[in-house]
Swiss-Prot record:
The gene is pdxB. The active site is at R209, E238, H255 (proton donor). PROSITE patterns: D_2_HYDROXYACID_DH_1 (PS00065). It comes from Porphyromonas gingivalis (strain ATCC BAA-308 / W83). Pfam families: 2-Hacid_dh (PF00389), 2-Hacid_dh_C (PF02826). The lineage of its organism: Bacteria, Pseudomonadati, Bacteroidota, Bacteroidia, Bacteroidales. This is Erythronate-4-phosphate dehydrogenase. SUPFAM superfamilies: Formate/glycerate dehydrogenase catalytic domain-like (SSF52283), NAD(P)-binding Rossmann-fold domains (SSF51735).
Length: 369
């Protein structure tokens, strides 16, 4: 079977090659000529699978190592007998890890305890669900807002956004970008919402889609003191981000929240599982697909006099590292994404020197203890 894979999809080499004829191409080398005889494509979101690319080719399955699938023309695929599969939830833990580590940084800077804060999670899909799990393990109180799920499931445990504004110290957004009513999310973080935050002054986090937030409204909100802190990973108009907003954000990163090595491995694995599902092609070495171990896999809590859970989390990922890089060179936003050294998730780290209570919390967040 002929497969063409994007060269930036990791961990495929040595697993696919023994059982299929696979070619690795950089995304800008994908063309009707280079993929003409491929039955399967393995791509990321940078490769646009449009009629201009697919017409006249032998492609019958497109797999993407990403949760998102806006880069695939689904209508064209359906009308031309081309199946497609995405990788839902592949980086959900990575995004939740990002949020928790950002909150740890803010807690250390401001001197508050996260256990005293109420977190509001807007959008409770794969990512929101993982964030709920980690926050619960940590011992945080949380409220959930997901209007489409509330409507579909008739579940009154989901609250309206206005209730989160009234009760939450932290509001983290994990919604898709949609323009269609009744649950449009475009500029959901807009002037009206931000003005309503003025009394409670929450920490606001956007780690979903840039255009979920109105850039100019965010700038006004920070300047007006409506927010305690602002964390931004996703930006309107990226890679050409607004420099005024960059200056005002407390933590600013170049859309890397989901970029863990584990998330990349999950995406690659799910692509190969889709090929097996559709064509029956088995990959005997699939069990070996795994990211490399972290450079420093042992976390010794005895080295830290206080804030030990926060220090353990920040050992896995410190958002101030990409924050400093972005502030130093905002014009290289895309280059920083491409060169980003993908961190490992918590399950790759062993914690020693923990108390019984700390060990229970850390195990709940996937650490080995």
């Amino acid at each position: 079977m002929k497969i063409v894979a994007e060269a930036s999809v990791p961990y495929l080499r040595g697993i696919v090659d023994p059982v299929a004829d696979i070619t690795y191409l950089h995304s800008d080398c994908f063309s009707p000529d280079t993929i003409r005889h491929a039955r399967v494509l393995i791509v990321r979101s940078i490769t646009k699978c449009t009629p201009a690319l697919l017409q006249g080719t032998d492609v019958r399955l497109i797999t993407t190592a990403t949760a998102g699938f806006d880069h695939i023309d689904r209508e064209y695929c359906e009308s031309h007998g081309i199946l497609w599969r995405n990788s839902p939830g592949c980086n959900a833990t990575a995004v939740a890890q990002y949020v928790m580590c950002c909150l740890c940084r803010l807690a250390l800077r401001e001197g508050f305890s996260l256990k005293e804060k109420v977190m509001g999670i807007v959008g409770v899909g794969h990512v929101g669900g993982e964030l709920k799990r980690l926050a619960s393990a940590y011992g945080m109180e949380f409220l959930l807002c997901d209007p489409p799920r509330s409507e579909a499931e008739q579940d009154n445990s989901f609250l309206p956004l206005s209730r989160l504004v009234e009760q939450c110290d932290i509001i983290s957004f994990h919604v898709p970008l949609t323009h269609e009513d009744p649950h449009a999310t475009y500029h959901l973080i807009g002037e009206a919402f931000l003005r309503s935050c003025a009394d409670k002054r929450p920490i606001l986090i956007n780690a979903c889609r840039g255009a979920v937030a109105d850039t100019q409204a965010l700038i006004r909100a920070v300047k007006s003191g409506w927010l305690q802190a602002l964390v931004i990973d996703c930006w309107e108009g990226e890679p050409d981000i607004d420099l005024s907003l960059l200056d005002l954000a407390d933590i600013a990163t170049p859309h890397i929240a989901g970029f863990s090595a584990d998330g990349k491995a999950n995406g690659a694995r799910m692509c190969l599982e889709a090929i097996t599902e559709v064509f029956g092609l088995e990959f005997p070495l699939l069990h070996t697909l795994a990211p490399p171990p972290p450079t420093h896999p042992i976390i010794d809590l005895s080295l830290f006099p206080d804030h030990r859970i926060e220090r353990a989390l920040l050992h896995t990922f410190d958002p101030l590292v990409p924050d400093r890089s972005l502030r130093a060179s905002p014009k290289t936003f895309e280059e920083q994404r491409k060169a980003y050294p993908h961190p490992r998730e918590m399950k790759a780290f062993t914690v020693v020197g923990a108390t019984t209570e700390e060990a229970k919390i850390l195990r709940g967040m996937d650490f080995i203890s």
